[in-house]
């Protein structure tokens, strides 16, 4: 299995740090509004990478954070006359709902930046101790960028070229030593959330959050760090500088980045009126269509979103789902008998489609070619199944198809709705977990219910739930 490593600018054979295990960190959204379709691309792409790794037998520890303290969240809270915590909590719930509708699996861990402040203070203290950071007179802590000799290795930028492009960055009133130094900790402002620290009451900079959460949940060294290509510089470059200076080892072996999503060949922006949330797309299409559309191009290729392309994705998905429904229908009335000689030959032939699928995915997760292999399997199925097919033959083809679709996150059979009693039992377990302050288990149960389309609402009277 080969993947393209942004760090080396070439495809490399994937060799995990520990045999059979993958430690993967994906930068998650800043939760101040409903997620937009640009946010959805990395969610779907790297969920599919994870699914294929699991298909290949790897145990994947998948961590994806929520940035729940940020200028945009604070601005939204001020506009609404509420707290930053209330805004982020609400939109985390909404984000998880959208993720479930796109069939994005919950991460092994979804850490929140605000729950990891102590770790951030510890890492900043270590960087100061090692001479990689310094506190200014006003309590702001900066990273001493030039001290990290490998700065620019991910974005392939020369630090002197960066300096030339940032001559005006050191504005009046800033107390940093160098124009390229970036913020690790910033002093509080009136009305903003803040935490006590050795330098001042304040809050962390954005970059330190991911370095700390990755270290806590995955360790000093990880296999894969991923996100959108807009994060390569400065966010991921700064993460490397922080983590490698603090921990003394290479931060991530492989770096993966997805390309941008454009709308009708234009960059998505609110000012152009071509800005769409996942929720808005969900009003017109099943979000399985959005997922299928996102996987119809290679993740490193720019993807153009348009009504025509979404209709094409809808039609393509329907071809697959219809073939699956046809097999299920035939299987209900099929004769229970041994495979015929012809059926055995056909099943042997059908393995070529799985091989083609795996070859595509082994080549830097080429989902476009993998989908092509699924379509070939669908055509093969439509040609060779009939009312005379044996149950064993139909089951084998269905299982093959489902196995490939599961990797892509394409649902070809709707799960039966959970019974009310099952839901109530899980809610009771969640309440008990919260009483015991086992918030991780409580969040896991909320995620399980979200995946099943059950939305919880905590009220003074207790927990209310409804089906999505």
Place the predicted regions along the sequence by residue.
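N-terminal, positively charged nucleic-acid-binding surface of large information/translation enzymes
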Residues: 8-13, 17-105, 461-465
């Amino acid at each position: 299995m080969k993947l393209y490593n942004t760090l080396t600018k070439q495809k490399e054979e994937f060799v995990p740090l520990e045999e059979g295990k993958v430690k993967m960190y994906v930068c998650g959204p800043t939760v101040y509004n409903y997620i937009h379709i640009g946010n959805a691309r990395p969610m779907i792409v790297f969920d599919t990478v994870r699914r294929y790794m699991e298909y290949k037998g790897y145990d994947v520890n998948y961590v994806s954070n929520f940035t729940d303290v940020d200028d945009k969240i604070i601005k939204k809270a001020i506009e609404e006359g509420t707290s930053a915590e209330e805004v982020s909590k609400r939109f985390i719930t909404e984000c998880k709902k959208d993720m479930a509708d796109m069939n994005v699996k919950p991460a092994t861990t979804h850490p929140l930046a605000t729950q990891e402040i102590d770790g951030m203070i510890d890492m900043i203290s270590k960087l100061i101790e090692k001479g990689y950071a310094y506190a200014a007179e006003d309590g702001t802590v900066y990273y001493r960028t030039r001290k990290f000799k490998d700065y620019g290795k991910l974005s392939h930028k020369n630090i002197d070229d960066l300096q030339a492009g940032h001559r005006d960055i050191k504005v009046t009133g800033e107390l940093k030593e160098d124009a390229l130094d970036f913020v690790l900790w910033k002093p509080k402002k009136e009305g903003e959330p803040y935490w006590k620290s050795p330098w001042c009451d304040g809050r962390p900079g954005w970059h330190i959050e991911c370095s700390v959460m990755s270290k806590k949940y995955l360790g000093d060294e990880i296999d894969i760090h991923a996100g959108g290509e807009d994060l390569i510089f400065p966010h991921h470059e700064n993460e490397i500088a922080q983590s490698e200076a603090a921990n003394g080892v290479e931060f991530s072996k492989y770096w993966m980045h997805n390309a941008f999503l454009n709308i009708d060949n234009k960059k998505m922006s609110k000012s152009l009126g071509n800005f769409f949330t996942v929720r808005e797309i969900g009003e017109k299409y099943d979000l399985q269509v959005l997922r299928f559309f996102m996987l119809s191009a290679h993740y490193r290729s720019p993807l153009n979103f348009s009504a025509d392309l979404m209709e094409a994705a809808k039609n393509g998905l329907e071809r697959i789902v219809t073939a699956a429904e046809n097999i299920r229908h035939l299987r209900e009335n099929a004769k229970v008998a041994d495979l015929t000689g012809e059926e055995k030959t056909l099943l042997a032939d059908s393995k070529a489609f799985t091989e083609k699928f795996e070859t595509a995915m082994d080549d830097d997760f080429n989902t476009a070619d993998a989908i092509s292999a699924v379509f070939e399997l669908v055509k093969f199925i439509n040609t060779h199944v009939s009312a005379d097919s044996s149950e064993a033959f139909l089951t084998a083809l269905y299982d093959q198809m489902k196995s490939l679709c599961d990797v892509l996150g394409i649902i070809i059979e709707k799960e039966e709705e959970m019974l009310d009693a099952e839901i109530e039992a899980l809610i009771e377990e969640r309440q008990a977990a919260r009483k015991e302050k086992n918030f991780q288990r409580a969040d896991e149960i909320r995620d399980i219910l979200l995946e099943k389309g059950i939305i919880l609402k905590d009220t003074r009277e207790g927990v209310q739930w409804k089906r999505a």
